[in-house]
């Protein structure tokens, strides 16, 4: 802070720019990260990018039963949900420290 309690705007701007760069780097890491989720003890495995995009699905032939399509559908949904949950955990892990840095806002600027 400068004399009189006014915030040092150049320091605040530098801090904001640094946080923006860190956020962009974390977002890039998330976009490249892939996580897998499974259901049925690994009979169905889904691969999801950190962005939530489903990029892979493996189904063990043992679980394919034309007489019981509903079970296969449930397993696919379960595997995708598991992978999506893990992708959200990765996002929280990568973005959490940055969000914590924003928790106090920008000192000296109300509403930020």
UniProtKB/Swiss-Prot annotation:
Pfam families: YbaB_DNA_bd (PF02575)
Primary site of residence: cytoplasm
Cellular component aspect of the GO annotation: bacterial nucleoid; cytosol
Subcellular location: Cytoplasm, Nucleoid
GO MF annotation terms: DNA binding
InterPro entries in UniProt: YbaB-like_sf, YbaB/EbfC
Swiss-Prot/TrEMBL keywords: Cytoplasm, DNA-binding
Record Gene3D superfamilies: Nucleoid-associated protein YbaB-like domain
SUPFAM superfamilies (alphabetical): YbaB-like (SSF82607)
Domain of life: Bacteria
Entry annotated with the keyword RNA-binding: no
UniProt similarity note: Belongs to the YbaB/EbfC family.
Subunit structure of this chain's protein: Homodimer.
Functional description taken from the UniProt entry: Binds to DNA and alters its conformation. May be involved in regulation of gene expression, nucleoid organization and DNA protection.
Protein name, as recorded: Nucleoid-associated protein RER_03900
Lineage of producing organism: Bacteria, Bacillati, Actinomycetota, Actinomycetes, Mycobacteriales
């Amino acid at each position: 802070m400068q004399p009189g309690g006014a915030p040092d705007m150049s320091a605040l701007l530098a801090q904001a720019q640094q946080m923006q760069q860190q956020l962009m780097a974390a977002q890039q890491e998330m976009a490249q990260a892939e996580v897998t989720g499974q259901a049925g003890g690994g009979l169905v495995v889904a691969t999801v990018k950190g962005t939530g995009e489903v990029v892979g699905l493996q189904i063990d032939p043992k679980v394919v039963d034309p007489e019981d399509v509903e079970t296969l559908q449930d397993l696919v949904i379960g595997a995708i949900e598991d992978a999506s949950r893990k992708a959200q955990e990765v996002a929280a892990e990568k973005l959490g420290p940055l969000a914590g840095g924003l928790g106090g806002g920008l000192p000296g600027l109300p509403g930020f």
